């Protein structure tokens, strides 16, 4: 099983993210901590809903910053099935430390695991569906992430088996309708972008027709996004473009716009290299976790 924690640098800003999340939860006095004090306690962290466990390194950092000892019983990316237990829950981790520290860490850690596991689970479901049809290309998320949570959400897509797509505006140039309208044409937009991004950064162009896609390919775009095409129209356009430019131009075709678990199969074809969807991370249901002190 891949060790996704290795993606997170030792001195990375993700640790500061955790500090900020804890500070957001207790910006001044911890009144609840005063009530319970610092007696040594043990607690169980439960998962109460079937799904893929994700967010463990981030939750571990919460516990580390709260000076707690944790024993994880499952690895990142494990698929948990508490529904098979009579109790309807499963112990994911055991936590030891001062009572006030455990309760300080509780909600932040649970929120991280719930959100991250929800995204990983949705990603796992949609990539599994695609693979079950024989499709071997890429299923990706989008940049429509929650402000302040992009690192966590993109990480969760990877754990679930999907591609993150571009991480930010600096990772890849994506020229959409507004860029094209502002510059006058797809050709102008691609030319202007290439002048500053150089050879190392890819350029993607959002296209609404085969003619626009052809212009983008001729202009030197690396990725052609066929946006909001319908199933049969998408497949015909993709096949036409691949046949026309075979051996002449190298580019990738991406399909985007309204894709989700319910309709993806209608759009899948081998001529499309990438399918991108925000459904795996935007408005995604969370996975239910809880934490209880031993008593």
UniProtKB/Swiss-Prot annotation:
It is found in: Cytoplasm; Nucleus. GO terms for cellular component: cytoplasm; nucleus. Substrate binds at residues 107, 142-144, 166, 176, 206, 227, 256-258. InterPro entries: Aldolase_TIM, NadC, NadC/ModD, Nicotinate_pribotase-like_C, Quinolinate_PRibosylTase_N_sf, Quinolinate_PRibosylTrfase_C, Quinolinate_PRibosylTrfase_N. Keywords: Cytoplasm, Glycosyltransferase, Nucleus, Pyridine nucleotide biosynthesis, Transferase. Its EC number is 2.4.2.19. GO terms for biological process: 'de novo' NAD biosynthetic process from L-tryptophan; NAD biosynthetic process; quinolinate catabolic process. Involved in the catabolism of quinolinic acid (QA). Present with 2660 molecules/cell in log phase SD medium. This is Nicotinate-nucleotide pyrophosphorylase [carboxylating]. It comes from Saccharomyces cerevisiae (strain ATCC 204508 / S288c) (Baker's yeast). The lineage of its organism: Eukaryota, Fungi, Dikarya, Ascomycota, Saccharomycotina.
């Amino acid at each position: 099983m891949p060790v996704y924690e290795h993606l997170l640098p030792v001195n990375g800003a993700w640790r500061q993210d955790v500090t900020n999340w804890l500070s957001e939860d207790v910006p001044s006095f911890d009144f609840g901590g005063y009530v319970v004090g610092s007696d040594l306690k043990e607690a169980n962290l439960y998962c109460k809903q079937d799904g893929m466990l994700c967010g463990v390194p981030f939750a571990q950092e919460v516990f580390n910053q709260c000076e707690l000892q944790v024993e994880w019983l499952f690895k990142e990316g494990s698929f948990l099935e508490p529904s098979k237990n009579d109790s309807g829950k499963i112990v994911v981790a055991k936590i030891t430390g001062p009572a006030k520290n455990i309760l300080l860490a509780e909600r932040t850690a649970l929120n991280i695991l719930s959100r991250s596991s929800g995204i990983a689970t949705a990603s796992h479901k949609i990539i599994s569906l695609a693979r079950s049809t024989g499709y071997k290309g890429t299923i990706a998320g989008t940049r429509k992430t929650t402000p302040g949570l992009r690192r966590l959400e993109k990480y969760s897509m990877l754990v679930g088996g999907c591609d993150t797509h571009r991480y930010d505006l600096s990772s890849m140039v994506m020229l959409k309708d507004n860029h094209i309208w502002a510059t006058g044409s797809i050709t102008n937009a691609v030319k202007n972008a290439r002048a500053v991004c150089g050879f190392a950064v890819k350029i993607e162009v959002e296209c609404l027709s085969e003619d626009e896609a052809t212009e983008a390919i001729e202009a030197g775009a690396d990725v052609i996004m066929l946006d909001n095409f319908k199933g049969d129209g998408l497949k015909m356009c993709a096949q036409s473009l691949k046949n026309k430019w075979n051996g002449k131009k190298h580019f990738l075709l991406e399909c985007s716009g309204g894709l989700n678990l319910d309709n993806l199969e209608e759009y899948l074809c081998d001529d499309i290299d990438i399918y991108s969807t925000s459904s795996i991370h935007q408005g995604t249901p969370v996975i239910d976790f809880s934490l209880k002190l031993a008593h």
